[in-house]
């Protein structure tokens, strides 16, 4: 649950045997899992972000003003995570259930809104009004204001993604081009467009 959405059967057996060995004590089991699994180098991209992890990471990166708890709760419910009201004692299914086509579309819409400094609307009328508003709140993204386009792309992808490939790199270089000037008037907006593209990528949905 902490590291894998779908752990391999040998891991389940390995830790299950240890759990029995320590007389079903939770603490030593968790210590063993965290000690052994977190030290591995290949655990990146093994879990899909749940809605809470997703929205908190976005608001943290953009340094938004503290969102209203009701707004966050509304977004989570839209995503199928009615906070403090799981469907059963097991909790939410998690895993691939956090990345249906509808949920992915909702996430991308929220990414667009937050990257342009707009709040998450909670009603049809509010959605229509939000689309026509200028920035509803200030946002601030940390990036190297002296870097080249490739250096800034690397900075953000290293921070936000567990891995990249040539195709994604090329797509990002089309957004933040080789002649990018970090001191130009529109530099921050250009980097925000890059950030928006990264957080809308399938790779960003993974931990």
What would you call each of these model-derived segments?
Residues 1-22, 27-207:
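Flexible, low-complexity segments enriched for small/polar residues
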């Amino acid at each position: 649950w902490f590291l894998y959405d779908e752990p391999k059967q040998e891991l389940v057996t390995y830790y299950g045997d240890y759990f029995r060995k320590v007389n079903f004590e939770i603490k030593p089991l968790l210590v063993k899992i965290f000690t052994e699994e977190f030290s591995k180098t290949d655990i990146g991209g093994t879990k899909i972000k749940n809605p809470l992890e997703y929205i908190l990471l976005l608001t943290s990166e953009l340094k938004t003003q503290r969102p209203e708890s009701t707004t966050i709760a509304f977004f989570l419910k839209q995503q199928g995570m009615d906070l403090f009201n799981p469907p059963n004692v097991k909790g939410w299914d998690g895993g691939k259930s956090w990345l249906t086509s509808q949920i992915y579309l909702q996430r991308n819409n929220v990414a667009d809104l937050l990257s342009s400094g707009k709040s998450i609307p909670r009603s049809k009328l509010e959605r229509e009004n939000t689309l026509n508003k200028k920035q509803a709140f200030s946002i601030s993204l940390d990036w190297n204001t002296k870097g080249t386009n490739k250096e800034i792309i690397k900075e953000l992808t290293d921070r936000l993604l567990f891995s990249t490939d040539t195709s994604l790199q090329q797509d990002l270089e089309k957004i933040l081009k080789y002649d990018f000037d970090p001191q130009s008037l529109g530099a921050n907006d250009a980097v925000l467009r890059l950030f928006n593209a990264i957080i809308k990528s399938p790779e960003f949905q993974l931990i």
